[in-house]
Amino acid sequence: MSASHKNLHSKLSIGGLLITLGIIYGDIGTSPLYVMKAILGNHTINADIVLGGISCVFWTLTLQTTIKYVLITLSADNHGEGGIFALYALVKKTKIQWLIVPAIIGGSALLADGIITPPISISSAVEGIRAFYPTMQTQTIVYIVITILFILFTIQQFGTKLVGKFFAPMMLIWFAMLGTLGFIQIMHFPEVIKAINPYYAYHLLSVHPDGFFVLGFVFLCTTGAEALYSDMGHCGRKNIRISWIFVKTTLVLNYFGQAAYLIHHEGSTLQQLGGENGNPFYLIMPHWFLPFGIVVATLAAVIASQALISGSFTLINEAMRLNFWPKVKIKYPTEVKGQLYIPSINWLLFFGCVGIVLHFEKSGNMEHAYGLAIILCMIMTTILLNYYLIMKRVKLYFMVPLITIYLLIEFSFLIANITKFAEGGYVTLIIAILLISIMTIWYLAKKINKNYTKVIKIDDYKKVLMELSEDLSIPKYATHLVYMTNANSVDELEEKVIYSILQKRPKRADIYWFVHVNILTEPYKTQYKVTEIAKDDIYRIDFNLGFREPTKINLMFREVIRDMVKRGEVDITSRYESLNKNNIIGDFKFVLSEKFLSNDNDLRWHENIIMNSYFFIKKLSLSEERAFGLDSSSVKIEKFPMVLHAPENIGLTRITK
């Protein structure tokens, strides 16, 4: 890990705490915009439901967010980084193959959540305008929300370095506003504090006819807990844990303040109190304060959306490095480490968000679609966390009850959320299934490809390569010929590479270079190793890169060459006499292989589906040369047929007459 990055997120400081407010808590911090509104819906306000609901909210924030994520899961860091893929990279060391399943399901569910969070947060905030303009059409609200989304996704290409400076003070104002508004209402009806007693939650769940299914809406208060873990690398465990004390306090005050207001108006409905989009979040505000409250809420919702978008970019980047996702173009708009921009994902998210807004129109309708995907992610995190605790040799008498309790809690939330399937939950589930399918196909195809890749010992061909280099009867193909190789062992090489050099068209070069990229299970590391196979003839370079590092092979390779020349380990000047005496450096040529599925295959039905789907997706993804950051003018693409199962007997008969 780079020192600069390590220092960035490891220190506890006032600045670090403020940055944490601006980055980490957008999702969970904007939940008061819609949680109590979702719990009540169109029903008449009932004290039992309000007290039971707010008790469930308090204990969900305590058990799920505080204990599971802030205290336990944040301890499972991968060199300071968090998130479900970082956790998978840790437990991958156990060599348990099936752990890939919860990793893919969890990552896909988290990405699906990124499509619903911006629309519901921004819509909930913007709908507050109706407090001043009750007759405002729903379509007008929809257009405003889409406009905000368009601006938000458009500025992603410029990075968040500039606007990011305002995130922290803005979220500080937001949380201070939440706490103050809630506290004022509690002072009017202090009895609401009794809802801290878990009896009220139990009473709601066990006695009230629809009590259990209220959990589906209660869960919305903790959907942002996974983001606390995913963004740990930006702020650090200590900063998150300390700042959470302040954040949870303001959230609890606001939730209880909304509950106090509602109990005071028992017997009414939200629609009677605030019109079509009656929302207790805005109802507890003094009328004169509403303009300021709406603006602050909208800005907080935008910041929450920004955090989800940035998190999605990071997640896709990690998925690519772990071979879960096809290669896509990545840009680095600023020099801030870890900040990246993925154009294709950015606009897919945008159109997904717009689709959600157009389909559901109102935040109240979106509440039914929200929660199902993220609870799946949380369950998958719990499964992976279990193996992390085993890996850390945590005592069974502590680990087994802990994991069992959380699986029971989370499966209860899952069952409650499934009831919302027909009313909107199907949307995020369909998106999650689509993402799971892409990741599974890509991973299995890569695995099949690896299993059928033939490797040879490079020593068996060292002599012939050296002879080819000296064979003046063959035209020189390049001074330096560079091949990318997937062979993990330094003394091995794919058979197709040797075939390309010796048989497809003999390629004479002064020096042959074989470059291998090894993705590490830790996030930030850039190392390389040089293996001399034959002095001034054959070399292998192994790059060891963290799973969050950009793969800029062209720049890295040239840096390695400069270092080798400086050390006197290689002579890269042209061997043409006229050029050599003037110290002219020879040219470099990269040769990349592009596979296609051969017709000479007798694949099993499932392999046929996987491989055809893989090559279809591959056509839409980034080319190898762009993925490795190579200059297209110095790259040669060669196509190779991919034969996995050649037919054993094609039934051909020779005729002698």
Swiss-Prot record:
Protein's cellular compartments: Cell inner membrane
Source species, domain of life: Bacteria
Its biological purpose: Transport of potassium into the cell. Likely operates as a K(+):H(+) symporter.
A GO CC term assigned to this protein in UniProt: plasma membrane
Disulfides per UniProt: none
UniProt key word Electron transport: no
Family according to the record: Belongs to the HAK/KUP transporter (TC 2.A.72) family.
Catalytic activity field: K(+)(in) + H(+)(in) = K(+)(out) + H(+)(out)
Main subcellular location: membrane
Membrane-spanning residues: 14-34, 47-67, 96-116, 140-160, 166-186, 201-221, 242-262, 283-303, 340-360, 371-391, 396-416, 425-445
Coiled coil in keyword set: no
Keywords: Cell inner membrane, Cell membrane, Ion transport, Membrane, Potassium, Potassium transport, Symport, Transmembrane, Transmembrane helix, Transport
Topology of the protein relative to the lipid bilayer: Multi-pass membrane protein
GO molecular function per UniProt: potassium ion transmembrane transporter activity; symporter activity
Protein's name in the database: Probable potassium transport system protein Kup
Organism the protein comes from: Flavobacterium johnsoniae (strain ATCC 17061 / DSM 2064 / JCM 8514 / BCRC 14874 / CCUG 350202 / NBRC 14942 / NCIMB 11054 / UW101)
Pfam family, one: K_trans
